[in-house]
């Protein structure tokens, strides 16, 4: 515990906020080749690699992921939700924030049903989260 005199000499520093989705906090001006401070809820990018990885210890699966080169020159790893996907290299995707707890380093989700990503086929419940259209009667 510091004394009052110590606090007068060197006050307490406010805690700095560290973003959970750093790639969404910057834009990119391609004309001047500089970062801009424009934050965004989603970002567009191009898939550079699509594959599967295994989750952390208590879980077991092959989780689908894509390495995405964003429009602000960041390269991030994003999770592909839902059963089955049509993504391949050079697919244009839209990403949002949201980590996957059992995949280390995956802080983003790909939005299904946007740009080149198809929605989940045959999905009846929670369709809006997976870009699935309403089935015809």
Curated annotation (Swiss-Prot):
Give Gene Ontology CC terms.
small ribosomal subunit
User: PROSITE patterns in the record, alphabetically?
Assistant: RIBOSOMAL_S12
Source taxon at top rank: Bacteria
Q: Name one GO biological process term.
A: translation
Q: Does the keyword Glycoprotein apply?
A: no
Matching entries from NCBIfam families are given as: rpsL_bact
As for what it does, the entry says:
With S4 and S5 plays an important role in translational accuracy. Interacts with and stabilizes bases of the 16S rRNA that are involved in tRNA selection in the A site and with the mRNA backbone. Located at the interface of the 30S and 50S subunits, it traverses the body of the 30S subunit contacting proteins on the other side and probably holding the rRNA structure together. The combined cluster of proteins S8, S12 and S17 appears to hold together the shoulder and platform of the 30S subunit.
What residues bear 3-methylthioaspartic acid in this entry? Answer: 102
Q: What is this protein called?
A: Small ribosomal subunit protein uS12
The record lists the lineage as:
Bacteria, Bacillati, Bacillota, Bacilli, Lactobacillales
Give any GO molecular function from the UniProt entry. Answer: structural constituent of ribosome
What family is reported? Belongs to the universal ribosomal protein uS12 family.
Biased composition, class Polar residues, residue ranges: 31-41
| Keyword field contains Isomerase | no
């Amino acid at each position: 515990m510091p004394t009052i005199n110590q606090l007068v000499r060197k006050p307490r520093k406010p805690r700095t906020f560290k973003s959970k989705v750093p790639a969404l906090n910057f834009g990119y001006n391609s004309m001047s080749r500089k970062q801009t401070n424009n934050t965004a809820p989603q970002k567009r990018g191009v898939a550079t690699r699509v594959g599967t990885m295994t989750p952390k210890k208590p879980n077991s699966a092959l989780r689908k992921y894509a390495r995405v080169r964003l429009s602000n020159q960041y390269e991030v790893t994003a999770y592909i939700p839902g059963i089955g996907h049509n993504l391949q290299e050079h697919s244009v995707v839209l990403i949002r924030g949201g980590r996957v707890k059992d995949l280390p380093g995956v802080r983003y989700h790909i939005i299904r049903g946007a740009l080149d990503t198809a929605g989940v086929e045959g999905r009846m419940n929670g369709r809006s989260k997976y870009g699935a259209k309403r089935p015809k009667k």
